[in-house]
Swiss-Prot record:
Cell wall formation. ATP binds at residues 133-139. The gene is murC. Keywords: ATP-binding, Cell cycle, Cell division, Cell shape, Cell wall biogenesis/degradation, Cytoplasm, Ligase, Nucleotide-binding, Peptidoglycan synthesis. The lineage of its organism: Bacteria, Pseudomonadati, Pseudomonadota, Alphaproteobacteria, Rickettsiales. This is UDP-N-acetylmuramate--L-alanine ligase. It is an enzyme of class 6 (ligase). Its EC number is 6.3.2.8. One of its GO terms (molecular function) is ATP binding.
Amino acid sequence: MRILNYTIINLVISKSLLLNMNGIKKGIIHIIGIGGIGMSAIAEILHNSNYKVQGSDAQSNNNVDRLQKLGIEIYIGHNANNIKQAQVVVYSSAIKSDNVELVAARNNNKTILHRSGILAEIMKDKYVIAVSGSSGKTTTTAMIASIFDHSNTDATVIVGGILNSYQNNSKLGKSDILLIEADESDETMLKIPANIAVITSINNDHIDHYGTFDNIKNAFSQFINSADFAILPDSVGINDSESVSIKFGFEGVYPFVIQSPFVVPVHDIGIKKKKSASCSIKASNVKANNIRQHNNSIEFDVLIDGCSIDRSHWIPASCTETTAVLPLSSTQITSLRSRIIKNVVLSNAIGMHKVSNALAAISVAIKLGINDVDIKKGLLEFKGVARRFSLVADIKDVKLIEDYAHHPSEIQATLTAARSITKGKIIGIIEPFRFARIRNFFDEFIRIFMMFDYVILVPVHPPEDKPILGCRIDDIQEALISNGFNNVKIMNDALLISNFISDSTNSGDIVLFIGAGINVARLARETVVFMSGVEI
């Protein structure tokens, strides 16, 4: 279902609150790797929609525990017998082709769906808002969800992180709106039928999957062009080989554009003009200005440039320098009102990159017609996302913070955010994620690690990842020392880490536990226990 004129006042409420996946046989749906952050969200949505769900995972974790409490049967360990009763078997790109359950499913002619396939089924007859990007997509999706929750927009939400407001990574809503974080690592975002496509940022991560940086940019371009409407950073530069991440200006103005992909954009963002278009219309800008970082929140003003548009003649009427393009009926005249939303407070946020995330969320809200009061309330009540610059503990005025960053640009953004709230030392407890990523960005990692005051390296995640010559943590340590950075150690013991922190920190210092793996998260909590005697 493609809805072009879609605002809050004309939301179509589903006659049935349950998902209706006619393409999938009724029966047991078995999810391989059900404890993963994305797969667990799918499992819960299906379960809450009265589908019979079971699954398996190599080991138990918090997601597995949560799903088991809901009554979902989960096998620990993979075994061909696990899928005997299943009609449908779901897997993700993380599951190898020789997985015993996947092999058994093929041999027994089970219906097999990739994660993107089951998502496509879930999204049938939904108005889909898909948030993708190299970084920032989880936080942006969570901010949109918070605005929805405070504007009576009862959307279904599927996100790749634990939202603190839900203590969960999914929610089954009653409206036809579905908000989803769209994974770019395996091109899942290209299989999602998005009505609104949101890009948060683009960098050269996942080069092993895509082959070249141009392929990454082309994939995001396809993502935009497949949607009815696109929201993306002003300087995302899909066709720019030099820099494609969000660029923050020097004057404190952070633009985000709202752009309908059937026109040529004002900025070179790789959106091709569709055949139905007969002229170029510039995009609307949504900007943040007068930005103030507080202790655990950011306050700013939102500037919205708009114009009136007569789609019957494809000629902008009384447009400002940057103009809005909304998907309307062929004869309708509308306007995106130029205005300022003063004193927006984004709670539980530190760092200018969070402002960009908020602007993307605000842009979605504007597109859907959510009023300014509800937008402000949703961001004020934003509770954050687990492991996204999350405070683990504050011990003797030394803050222990964990963050999911694992790409060099993400680690640098996390470090910059920490520098913005302290003049003290910053210690990085860093768990590199995958040897291939270390190989691809070795020099960048070295450059950024040298920006810390101290670095403690922990073993590469995941532990089963095949080592690459020259990319071990010993090699990282050696490279740092050879470049004159001697404040680096290798540790994998919370007691040793806690002793080091106690001996090396003073009031006002910050310790960052950085990485996407479970080991660094475990170390963060165990370190707190050793330092404070309090379990968390």
